[in-house]
């Protein structure tokens, strides 16, 4: 075929432009490294307006934030599809399905499986498929995808971070640590591998080790996207918080490494707000929000801006809480109504999945207002946040909703139920001081002698990590 070049993976692309291929390859690197210059893909269609791969990748990049600009690129890709290489046609099919209105997630995943079967070195398509699986709450599919291409990518560092995260989400922490360490050996600057290892250390209550590791790695994070930069620091702050470091230390990380990101001219505010509000909810549940002064109110004022609504469910659920908690009740109600409308506009199959997310948002709205008993009415009797992956959140991000659930039970005088929920969590992570404090409170409310031992355990753990 005339005018063929090959991309980073060695796959054929119909173009005569070296600069177009260079922009595509730069985009690949930015995606896999969580760089902040993913917009480089917009250069590729300028360098060759007839290149299908350039147009469809640029359309995908713009699809979530600026769909009106994405449409002409999608149409350009369609119009030149007949002349494209087989690789480009398969990528086009997968992305076209992914960005279509009311897409069928299952079909989109299947198309990516097909793509990766024929073109297994395409790690950006693997990443794209894994992100889709994450928002579907299907880590099992994510693992199958990466395992399908692992054998031909064993020398690629990025593959191991992607493998590790899938394993983490399936609770296979030992396997995840092994995979992440392999990736770290190949490339010690891969931020997604840092992230995976921090997940492992955090889950295993190795809080000090996690903080030391991440702070050492942080010198390589300046070029990360707003999300990845602040998310890695969110993990650091969370380790300080869970390890019972002084609340002022958590506040310092919030100020210097999360909120400060907004000062950068190329920051993506919504990505920062997700990590900021997620951390402040954790602090709030622990009764430490006073140490943060007016930071929650400042954040909530930013979140009244509807430009940050309906970007993703996880953020919306947290925003509902932040608004209701700071007195912006009418705004929170407006966001809730928008979520209900959003659900009504998707396929019946997706409506069933997202109903659970809607109930969680309703519960967080009531919790923010201090209506604990009302909030509990929206959640199952045997609530477990692990069953809410559909909002697009990791196990660590979901954990806070278990803490909220237990807190609401205690605030409603339901100590026996709280004890059952806490004991279930302690079987997984018995080194968490806050859970022992909650257990102590639950036992005290039930007038049980076990409160003394729970308090001693909490005190010992509070002194174990950072004191």
Language-model features and meaning:
Residues 18-21, 26-42, 46-50, 55-106, ...:
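Inter-helical turn/loop elements of alpha-helical hairpins
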Residues 19, 48-54, 86, 119-125, ...:
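Residue-level recognition of tetratricopeptide repeat
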Residues 19, 26, 58, 93-98, ...:
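Structural register within alpha-helical repeat arrays
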Residues 31-34, 65, 100-102, 119, ...:
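Structural motif corresponding to the intra-repeat A-B loop/turn of tetratricopeptide repeats
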Residues 43-44, 77-80, 114-115, 148-149, ...:
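Canonical positions in the second alpha-helix
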Residues 75-193, 200:
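Internal alpha-solenoid helical repeat scaffolds
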Residues 241-465:
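Helix-coil-helix junctions within alpha-helical repeat/solenoid scaffolds
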């Amino acid at each position: 075929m005339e005018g063929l070049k090959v991309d980073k993976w060695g796959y054929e692309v119909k173009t005569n432009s070296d600069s177009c291929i260079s922009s595509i390859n730069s985009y690949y690197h930015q995606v896999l490294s969580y760089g902040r210059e993913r917009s480089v893909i917009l250069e590729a269609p300028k360098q060759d307006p007839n290149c299908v791969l350039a147009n469809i990748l640029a359309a995908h990049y713009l699809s979530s934030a600026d769909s009106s600009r994405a449409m002409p690129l999608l149409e350009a890709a369609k119009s030149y599809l007949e002349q494209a290489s087989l690789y480009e046609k398969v990528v086009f099919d997968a992305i076209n399905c992914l960005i279509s209105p009311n897409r069928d997630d299952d079909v989109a995943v299947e198309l990516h499986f097909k793509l990766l079967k024929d073109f297994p070195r395409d790690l950006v398509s693997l990443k794209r498929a894994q992100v889709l699986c994450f928002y579907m709450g299907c880590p099992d599919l994510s693992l199958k995808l990466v395992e399908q291409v692992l054998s031909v990518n064993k020398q690629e560092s990025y593959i191991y971070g992607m493998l590790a995260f899938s394993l983490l989400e399936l609770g296979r922490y030992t396997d995840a640590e092994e995979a992440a360490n392999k990736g770290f050996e190949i490339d010690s600057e891969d931020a997604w591998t840092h992230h995976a290892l921090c997940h492992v250390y955090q889950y295993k209550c190795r809080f000090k080790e996690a903080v030391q590791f991440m702070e050492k790695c942080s010198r390589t994070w300046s070029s990360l996207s707003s999300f990845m930069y602040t998310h890695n620091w969110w993990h650091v702050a969370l380790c300080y918080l869970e390890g019972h470091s002084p609340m002022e230390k958590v506040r310092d990380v919030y100020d210097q490494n999360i909120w400060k990101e907004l000062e950068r001219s190329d920051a993506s505010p919504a990505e920062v707000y997700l990590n900021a509000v997620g951390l402040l909810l954790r602090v709030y549940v622990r009764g430490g929000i006073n140490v943060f002064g007016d930071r929650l109110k400042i954040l909530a004022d930013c979140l009244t801006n509807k430009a940050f609504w309906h970007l993703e469910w996880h953020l919306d659920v947290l925003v509902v809480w932040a608004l209701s908690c700071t007195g912006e009740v009418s705004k929170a109600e407006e966001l809730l109504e928008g979520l209900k409308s959003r659900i009504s506009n998707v396929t019946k199959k997706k409506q069933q999945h997202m109903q659970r997310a809607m109930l969680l948002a309703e519960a967080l709205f009531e919790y923010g207002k201090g209506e604990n008993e009302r909030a509990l009415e929206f959640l199952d009797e045997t609530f477990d946040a692990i069953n809410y992956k559909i909002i697009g959140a990791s196990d660590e991000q979901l954990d806070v909703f278990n803490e909220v659930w237990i807190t609401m039970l205690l605030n409603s005088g339901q100590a026996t139920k709280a004890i059952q929920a806490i004991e279930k969590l302690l079987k997984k992570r018995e080194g968490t001081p806050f859970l022992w404090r909650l257990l102590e409170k639950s036992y005290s409310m039930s007038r049980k002698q076990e409160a003394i031992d729970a308090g001693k355990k909490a005190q010992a753990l509070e002194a174990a990590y950072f004191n």
